[in-house]
Amino acid sequence: ERRGTREDMFTCLKIAAQQFYKREGDKCYLLAGYPWFKASAREEFMALPSCTIGIGRPEYWDLIVNNTAVEEIRNFMEGKPCKLVGMDEPDVLLWFIRALQEYAAYTSIEEVTRLYGQLIIDIMLYIRRQQHPRLFLHNNGLLWVDGRNQPATWMNAVENGRPITPRTGYVVEINALWYNARLFTATIQR
């Protein structure tokens, strides 16, 4: 398929975004960095709307989400091995819900509810039932993370196997994603 000419900023971004698609058989991932990084759950779910529907490539949303991401999330929640790196990071499932919210803006709430409603509910129950190994829901309704021995956020640089910036507690961006996920879940359950 021809990429097109680099006439304007959008076309340049579209061409660049498509370089991050990585196909493996019937699976498709977004690379976290080209060409040196592999597919990483956090970066994939953060970039997913922009690198698919945002550039007019909804077929890649289908390939990445329906053929790969849903299976990876289910495997993680069932304690099975995952190919996607970082599925256990505290904010990953919340970033996936945020990506679905962006997809709802592109399609409709009804479409997202039909396709992914049960998965969203399962993710929220997984977190609320304290099944996530690195997220802890406290009585105040906030999520708490322990980043002393293993990075808990996007600030994930390590030295000698220890986080350079250990972030422990009620991390603001994780709780912002949590609040958003709760509101979105309430919307799809109406």
Question: What residue spans do the PLM features occupy?
Answer:
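Acidic, mature catalytic/reactive cores of soluble proteins
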Residues: 1-190
